[in-house]
């Protein structure tokens, strides 16, 4: 797709709802060019222009930038109707206070984003937040909004979570491959139901560190620590160990509500009678 022409005012029909620019498009979009019917806008790979205040219509709900986009988002440039915002690979700009509209519920940063996100930057209505491959900044307490339910970190993230960092609304937390920090008791919120560790996580799970709300726990490739009795919450129903796990399963270490248990390829231990809970319905060695 070679289209790379200025879009003239009035050239787009008033009923258009979805607009996708191809890879080559890299023109400033003047205010008043895009119709007020537009709900979904996608820029291609080469687009890297400042988004001028007033250039995006108040009807817009979904905005996706391509991999070259790396411009500061000015306060007032994104419409208050926007609910989903996706940045591409190259975006690595400071997120200015007031630049993200309060209507936003889903925010995805691309691989290169590696900026501190200060408290008050992310809108309160945000429910889903995804950081990309290279993000590795401390997340200050109070910087994640209180309505956040799903949080995903990329490959490079390896920071300690300070107390009060993760909001009590959080239900799903996914940590990237490089994360390998002890998770102290009180760090994870009691709302959390799904926790996924990445490839290199290999720390002892301390009793009381996993909340009683947790139902699904997945360990990554390298995890190979003894599971101490009382360290896994009774709410847990699904437990998955990764490739390297090869520890004796201690009596009383698996919760009584567990229904699905998966061991990795390296597991080769005798399982003593009474070790596996009677609630178990699916077992994979």
Tell where the protein language model's regions lie, with residue ranges.
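Conserved hydrophobic beta-strand positions in leucine-rich repeat
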Residues: 19-21, 41-43, 63-65, 85-87, ...
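A detector of long low-complexity, disordered segments enriched in serine/threonine/proline
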Residues: 1-2, 284-285
């Amino acid at each position: 797709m070679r289209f790379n022409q200025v879009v003239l005012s009035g050239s787009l029909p008033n009923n258009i709802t979805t607009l996708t620019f191809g890879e080559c498009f890299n023109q400033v979009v003047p205010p008043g060019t895009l119709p007020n019917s537009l709900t979904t806008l996608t820029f291609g790979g080469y687009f890297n222009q400042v988004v001028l205040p007033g250039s995006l219509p108040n009807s817009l709900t979904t905005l996706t930038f391509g991999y070259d986009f790396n411009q500061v988002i000015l306060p007032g440039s994104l419409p208050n109707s926007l609910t989903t915002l996706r940045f591409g690979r190259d975006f690595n700009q400071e997120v200015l206070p007031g630049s993200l509209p309060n209507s936003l519920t889903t925010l995805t940063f691309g691989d290169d984003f590696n900026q501190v996100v200060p408290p008050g930057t992310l809108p309160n209505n945000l429910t889903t937040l995804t950081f990309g491959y290279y993000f590795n900044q401390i997340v200050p307490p109070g910087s994640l909004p209180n309505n956040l339910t799903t949080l995903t970190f990329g490959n490079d993230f390896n920071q300690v979570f300070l107390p009060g960092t993760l909001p009590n609304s959080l239900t799903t937390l996914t940590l990237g491959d490089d994360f390998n920090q002890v998770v102290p008791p009180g760090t994870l919120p009691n709302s959390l139901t799904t926790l996924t560790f990445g490839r290199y996580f290999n720390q002892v799970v301390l009793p009381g560190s996993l909340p009683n709300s947790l139902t699904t726990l997945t360990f990554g490739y390298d995890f190979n620590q003894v599971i101490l009795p009382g360290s896994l919450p009774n709410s847990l129903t699904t437990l998955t160990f990764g490739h390297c796990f090869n520890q004796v399963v201690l009596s009383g270490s698996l919760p009584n509500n567990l229904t699905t248990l998966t061991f990795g390829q390296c597991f080769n231990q005798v399982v003593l009678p009474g070790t596996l809970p009677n609630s178990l319905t699916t077992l994979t060695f």
